[in-house]
Amino acid sequence: MKSSLLLFAAILPLKGFAETADSTIAQHHTLEEVVVRGFKQDNLSKAPLSVSVAGSTFLQRNELNGLRDMSSVFPNLFIADYGARQNTPIYIRGIGSKTNAPSVGLYVDGMPYFERSVVDMDIAGISGIEVLRGPQGTLYGRNSTGGLINIYTYSPLDYQNTMAKISYGSRNDLRLGVNHYQKISSRVGINVAANYHHNDGFFRNLYTGAKADNLQSANAKVGLAWQATPLWTMRLSALFDHSTQGGYPYGHYHAVDNTADAVNYNRPGNYRRNLFTAGMNWLYKGNAVHFNSQTSVQLSKDKQQIDQDFTPRDLFFTITGLKQTLVSQEFTLRSAKDNSRYHWMVGAFGFYQRLNNTIETQFFTPNYATPKFYHTPTWGGAFYHQSAYDLTKTLRVAVGLRYDYERVAQDYEANKYTLTTGWSSLVRTATFNDHTHFSQITPKFTISQQLSTDKMVYASVARGYKAGGYNVTSTTTTLPAYDPEYNWNYEIGTKLGFLQGRLQTEMSLFYIDWKHQQVTTTVPGLGNIINNAGHSDSKGFELSATYRPLMGLELQANYGYTYARFLRYEKSATVHFTGNMLPMVPRQT
């Protein structure tokens, strides 16, 4: 385990933090009192769903710098930490995805992160994190069948400060960071940030003598906030992130005694990624309605080289590359009057994503290579609505409905050439061109009873949906595509406050019926193939307690339990996984 020593940290306040938490509201599953900043669900402490919230002070004190660090503090959230940043599977309540599009949504300041290779990075200036468990497809749609992670950063209109940080730890783990937030007028603020991270790595390659999993990353961010009128606010932000890593620190596994050999392969691997994300947000807060517009653009380019045989022998070597272009736009309109018995929200979302994949495997003994090219454009749109009605002063029912449409195409080309002669000997061996579309209606039903100002119970039923797509490693047209997957989430829960708000507890129980699950199968020498496994389920619960016996003293405990298994999965006529536990799903968190 890496230990770290903070050498220097300076916080130079220009003005105080303009936002303060409402201490009269019990923050359930809350790691500190923070202001809820989300537009779609602005009072999570009273929302009928299982949610965890962490604020900036907690994140800083616990040195939580990136997404992978969050597994240690949120119940029933697991983010695998293996290999390069290209692979960052996220699981909530056992629902997740290892290789294709994520099953847990990620939004940073309202901007979606749809591609799994871009979600793992160090994020500067985080003001709060929300983890919503269970399908959130009604309001968020794509890639949120397991849940959702919302990350918010400071606005220079609300927060003015300069922060500089240097930290050093074992494995030469060095972090440098500077963040500056400033108002340049009463209505305009700017922020700039720069961060750097270096780590020597943990595993040494016996063949090369060098560390196999070293890391260097750097990012820079600029932002602008403008309060155009008392009712209109605009935010602009742009982020550039660069990462360079070593290859996978893998060794041969021995199932008999459950041991693994040391890292020992002859061709050093590496992973490089450049990421650019920009967004513009317009927010209107009127007396009758609130309106939100979110525009975002994301460009990423990465390249990975890996000694795929993981041995000292020259068998085969794989080079992969991915270019992504993502453009999205969302409009949301909601009612603003809290004293009304009827609350509503409507919205529209559209996106275009283009993925260009390159996969080349070099076979040294046969002396040939097989470069393959995949062009996968996807576009989609959605309309959603949610209505909540107070049957009495304490009893509320809510219904949400979303329609999603998605069209995906793939243009595939396979080639082969001789390694000794190079690309001059290139010949085309296969082509494939196809397109398909998916559509779905995802509902959500909720009923909640407010027993008192700090006590409530609720029950909900929600449907999760994840569109299908095309494989990017299939060598033939027999298995190019995979179908959509679906789940139903059934949940009951309580949020209870005691001792005049000093003790806050939350409990939620869930059962997820997961059909046509998209499962990844590794084919030696080929890669990962996605197919629909059959039928799975996941069940469990979350418990949370926060106690504040004295001013400035807070005691917290969070616990999550998940039991997820295959109810039916016949991989082939002779291989059956029915009854097996789902991979990458810890029983207890």
Annotate each predicted stretch with a short phrase:
Residues R68-D109:
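Extracytoplasmic beta-strand/coil segments of soluble accessory domains associated
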Residues D109-P135:
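Short acidic/polar hinge/loop motifs at secondary-structure boundaries
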Residues L67-M70, P89-G94, Y107, G128-V131, ...:
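N-terminal periplasmic accessory domains that precede
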Residues V397, Y511-D513, N531-T589:
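Gram-negative outer-membrane beta-barrel transporters
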Residues N161-M163, Y168-N199, Y207-Q245, N274-F276, ...:
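Transmembrane beta-barrel wall of Gram-negative outer-membrane proteins
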Residues A225-T229, L239, L333-S335, H343, ...:
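Structural signature of Gram-negative outer-membrane beta-barrels, strongest in the C-terminal barrel
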